[in-house]
Amino acid sequence: KLEPGEPIAIIMDQTLTQDATGTMAYLQLEAMGVDQVQTELSVSYVDHNTLQSGFENADDHKYLQTVAEKHGVLFSRPGNGICHQVHLECFAKPGKTLLGSDSHTPTAGGIGSLAIGAGGLDVACAMAGRPFHLRMPSVIGIELKNELRQGVSSKDIILKVLQLLSVKGGVGRVMEYFGDGVKTLSVPQRATITNMGAELGATSSLFPSDERTLEFLRQQGREEDFEALEADPDAQYEKVITIDLAQLEPMIALPHSPDHVCTVREVEGMKIDQVCIGSCTNSSYHDLVSVGNIVKGKHVHKDVSLTVSPGSRQIFKELADNGTLSDLIEAGARILECTCGPCIGMGQSPITEAVSLRTFNRNFYGRSGTLSAKVCLVSPETAAYSALCGELRSPLGLTYEVPKEPAFMKSDRAMFIAPKPAEEAKDVTVVRGPNIRPLPVNTPLPDMIDKKVMIKVGDNITTDHIAPAGAKVLPYRSNIEKISTFVFMNNKADFHDCCKENGGGFIIAGANYGQGSSREHAALSPMYLGIKAVIAKSFARIHKANLINFGILPLTFTDESDYETIDEMDELRIEEIGSIHPGGKLSVYNVTKDC
């Protein structure tokens, strides 16, 4: 029944994984006993854990390469690029469904693909040919009118949407873009917008497939993949938001949330210490050539460190061929590998108390690797101009050459390793280094839980809070026992020890608990530590699904004021758990407070 809130199931045409979440997904696929994936296409990307300071990441990559060869999955080698940028260039198709073990999978919505982020177990099930289950989302229509002025970018569009809707405004919804302004945006510009639909909490974001889509597919040598798609003339939306692109100006998300948005003009002049340009949000050809044209013949301010991370090897090669790479180097930029890098705290942590301008999608507390840093999200144009000035500056009115897209861009298909044919695949040995640990197995929930509250947290707790990333933690994504020692490390340093001493217990949370990435480690690790239930005012979609997948009860307060009556280390009791059903009620008795 295609009505908002009703359960539905979708068969997925394509899947993608990245290495920080992929090892778990393929361990789960192996545990299912699946010989060959059942999708039209499944791709395993390596773009997160590329800082090889120990054997762990390299071991994970070898596991991913060999398990892909054995089970029919295409493998994208380290250095080939960020999964969403490469998938957009090489594989995403209008009208196809895509499920990815990364929350920014909806990037492909920029080409007209229904793309959804999910936990690794859901992606493993999709690879096994099983449908993806969710509740039918409602649809918000976003009408784009007119055309952007020079110095204003598609990043400013999505920051404006975040300002209007907040980080929970998209929960249970799909964002659908339409209007005469759509045709003024290229596919990569549209993909910037759909990418950050994840920050809205949206299930997906979608643009029509039109002549600009065909233009992009021709550029990539994939014209045969084109299919025209647009909303029905009588399409009905939950609500419609109209944005006049001609009136939009450069925007900025201030610390520590992507919806803490204002105009650059309102905070212009703020001294900055670091500028990082790249990520799956803003590392396209148009983005980076714009940056190159702004800094050409000039030099980065003496107090600013500027890094640039191309989104793919294809883009990196184009920058080298057209002279942009030379312009960036001469301007003082530090050129990084085609990976996620600083966006996930994998290197380039800023100085203490730094103000870091980043073209990324998230500025959560501590995500950069420096707890005291003030990370702000801006467009590539704002970032580049500010890097020259040493302070936040609006590029509105700045004169620079607007990039012209090449007619054709070549992909290096040698950076992909094809899976073995089914008969040969049987002989492939999957390589498992010592960092590849078996999946932890939960026990069935008892009919009664009597445990203490291990931690109480507020609103908008992210998966970065629950299961931090960064260079020190990410190498252990294949080792749940080890990575569990880092759970809530920046909120409650003794959380791990407290869980061990008490045999686990409860988590109490505010609204939008678990927003952010799709990392199922934010459910797996608490499960390993004995967490039986999370009681919150509300949940983010992907994290709630991950909690269910790993046997942790996601319970929502019927009366939000009850949140105030519970404290850390209170003993709570829940009975008759076996009677639970969707929409049903359970009573929680506070033994400590006798209420």
Predicted features along the sequence, with ranges:
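Fe-S-dependent hydro-lyases/dehydratases of central metabolism
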Residues: K1-C595
